[in-house]
A protein has these predicted regions:
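Ligand-binding clamshell of periplasmic/extracellular solute-binding protein-like
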Residues: 1, 6-12, 203-221, 292-295
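Append "and occasionally in soluble cytosolic enzymes with long acidic Gly/Pro-rich linkers
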Residues: 40-170
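Extracytoplasmic/peripheral linker and loop segments enriched in polar/acidic and small residues
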Residues: 39-42, 47-48, 52, 56, ...
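Extracellular/periplasmic solute-recognition and catalytic clefts
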Residues: 1-27, 57, 62-66, 70
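Short helix-loop capping/hinge motifs at secondary-structure junctions, enriched
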Residues: 20-46
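Short helices/loops that flank or line small-molecule/ion binding pockets
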Residues: 1, 45, 161-169, 186-203
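Short, well-ordered beta-strand elements
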Residues: 12, 141-152, 178-180, 204
Length: 302
C-alpha cells in the first residue's frame, strides 16, 4: 500500500516576472516578442488566464501519481486552514472577499487538497479580455513565456512539461506558448534564486519559488511580497526597487496598504485575520503569484 505524509506548511507557486531585463536563456527571437510578453504579464486578465489554465492535478501527478496528487494542491499562497477567526478558516475569509473582485472568482473553492482554480472556460474568458486590450497596445501573438527548469531533475522537467501542455491546451498554442528552457543546475540557480539582483533574473514565469512560515500569523506569508521586501520580490516577481514602475503599474502599492492596515490591528485577532484575508484576496486576484502545491509533505511512502 501507498501512504502519504501530511501536507506541509510551505507553498510552491509560480512567480511572474513583471520587469524582465535578462534574456541570456530565452527562446525569444525578436525585441517585439520580448515587448509583447512584458505587456501581457502586466495585464491582470492575462495573468488570471494562466492561473485558471493550469491543471494542478496533472502537474502534481508527476510527483505523487494521480491518486495522491490532490492531497498536495494549494489554491492560496497562505494555507486555507493556517489560522481561523471564530468558526471560519482563513480560506473562508478569503472566499468572502473574492466575490468583490469579479465574477471570474464565483464558485471557486480555495480549500487545500483539491484543484479549485483549474477552469479552462474561465481561462479562455480571461484571455479573451486580455487579448482585446493587448491587441490595442500592438502586442503580437502568440505570447512566448520562458520557463526555466533544471535539466538534471526528471521530476522538474516532467512538471514543466505538464504546465506547458495544460496551459497551451486551455488557451491555445496560437495564443500562448510555454518555452521550456532546460538549464544546468548552476545556470538554473543563477537565473533564478541566486541571481545577483533583479536585473539578472532570467525568466518570464518560474515554478521554482517556495516559501514556508516562520510563525503562526498570515503576515509570515504575505509580507514577503511588500514592495520593500526586495530580496523576495526579486525572486518571485523580478524587481527589487520599491519604486519600480512595473510594480506600481500592477498595483502593488495598494497591496502594501492592505498589509499595513492588517499589521496595525494588534488587539483583535479575528479582525487582524480578516484584514490579512483581504490582502490575500488582492494577491490571489492579481495572479502575480500563482499557487500550485504544498512545498513539502504530502509525499508518497510505500
Amino acid at each position: 500500500n501507498i501512504y502519504y505524509t501530511a501536507p506541509g506548511a510551505s507553498t510552491a507557486a509560480i512567480g511572474v516576472n513583471i520587469d524582465r531585463q535578462n534574456y541570456k536563456f530565452s527562446a525569444k527571437k525578436t525585441d517585439a516578442e520580448k515587448t509583447s510578453t512584458k505587456k501581457a504579464l502586466l495585464n491582470k486578465d492575462f495573468r488570471q488566464s494562466i492561473n485558471f489554465a493550469i491543471d494542478r492535478t496533472a502537474y502534481q501527478s508527476q510527483v505523487n501519481g494521480k491518486d495522491g496528487a490532490a492531497l498536495a494542491i494549494r489554491n492560496l499562497f497562505v494555507p486555507s486552514d493556517f489560522v481561523s477567526a471564530g468558526d471560519k478558516t482563513f480560506g473562508d475569509l478569503v472566499t468572502e472577499k473574492m466575490s468583490t473582485y469579479g465574477d471570474e472568482w464565483s464558485g471557486v473553492n480555495f480549500a487545500d487538497g483539491q484543484d479549485g482554480l483549474y477552469n479552462p472556460e474561465k481561462a479562455k474568458a480571461e484571455f479573451a479580455k486580455a487579448k482585446e486590450a493587448l491587441q490595442g497596445e500592438g502586442v503580437q501573438f502568440p505570447i512566448h513565456l520562458d520557463l526555466p527548469v533544471d535539466q538534471s531533475s526528471k521530476l522538474n522537467v516532467a512538471q514543466a512539461q505538464s504546465l506547458k501542455q495544460t496551459i497551451e491546451k486551455s488557451l491555445g498554442s496560437e495564443n500562448v506558448v510555454i518555452d521550456i528552457n532546460q538549464l544546468s543546475s548552476d545556470d538554473m540557480q543563477n537565473a533564478t534564486l541566486n541571481a545577483a539582483n533583479a536585473a539578472a533574473e532570467d525568466w518570464d514565469i518560474s515554478n521554482g519559488v517556495v516559501w514556508g512560515p516562520d510563525y503562526q500569523d498570515p503576515s509570515t506569508y504575505l509580507d514577503i511580497f511588500k514592495t520593500t521586501s526586495s530580496e523576495n520580490t526579486k525572486t518571485f516577481m523580478g524587481y527589487d526597487d520599491p519604486n519600480n514602475a512595473a510594480a506600481a503599474q500592477v498595483g502593488l502599492k495598494d497591496y502594501d496598504a492592505l498589509l499595513d492596515s492588517a499589521a496595525s490591528e494588534t488587539t483583535d485577532l479575528n479582525a487582524r485575520y480578516d484584514r490579512y484575508a483581504q490582502a490575500q484576496a488582492w494577491l490571489e486576484d492579481s495572479s502575480l503569484v500563482i499557487p500550485l502545491t504544498v512545498g513539502n509533505g504530502a509525499a508518497p511512502v510505500i
